[in-house]
Amino acid sequence: MSIKLLSLFHAFGESDSKILGSVEIINSQLIGTGACLPDFVLTNEMLEHMVDTNDEWIVQRTGVRERRIAKNMHTWELALGAAQDALADAKIDASELDLILVSTCTPDTNTPNTAAILQDKLGAGAIGAFDINNACTGFVSATDIADCYIKSGKAKTVLVVSAETLSRIVDYTDRGTCILFGDGAAAAVYRATEDESLGIQSTFVAADGSGAEYLRMEALPVEDPFAEDRTVDPKARFLKMQGAAVVRFTARAVPQAIDTALQRAGITADDIDWVVPHQANLRILDVIARRYHLPKEKVYVNMDRFGNTSSASVPICLNEMRRNGLLREGQTIVCTGFGGGLTYGAFVLKL
């Protein structure tokens, strides 16, 4: 078996040392993070004047107190700000990148993709740049792809950006959704390392399309292309969510994702220093802490200040933790995402 083929086995999750033999193992080390958050803050008190709700009701059910809204800002602008911040933190120039990945379910345009816009704005040169749309699991999925590129030798340095302007697709007359979501972007830079003790130790991503209707946002109307009246209902683009069904899915999917990632990394819950989950609902985050017998303070939470920012939530957390000195050398971090699709996943990161 060729060395190239062996590398591909490892890139796609094969961990059997008998198969890998003496092949050099390359890991994906996190070398920088960044974020870009809109200035405008939408508080629960402000929502009381827009929809039938109040601060106490929102906090008790979700944990959200305020969220950021991108007024007169494009998704690509948030993405660019986060990317520039991450590159500065990593102390590298965009010319050193081999690949740009953007996860978003709220792009400004279906084409061109947001990553291509970033490639130009950053001055990154002739490199690969593409978007993925995997809803709230987007950052975890993009990290998995970045790790595959690095492990296979196709890339040395990869920029992953998650950017969302969910306020565009939220119905502010629907108190079941408008209380949850916010806008924002964050980014991570991964670089190849030969140190097996650093970087991404394992990844896991999966989907359960049987729950597709639980979280849904129409892209293009299904209609007769030759119909005389092609008027589209303005509310057709709004996000629709069956909250109770999503919570039931999460209770099953998140432990499966984390357990699988831990198993693939060859570690147990006792080795975890931090869990960095998608910021969906405070009750869900409490369930994660209980499931893995972790103190609540070891499950990072910032959704009280930013709400649910879909794919951007995990990297926003990572950036905030890194800037506040909470991420330290030798720690083991588990990041997990879950949401529309339905999709779910996790990865283990060693610092």
Where are these regions (language model features)?
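Flexible, glycine-rich active-site loops centered on histidine and acidic residues
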Residues: 151-185
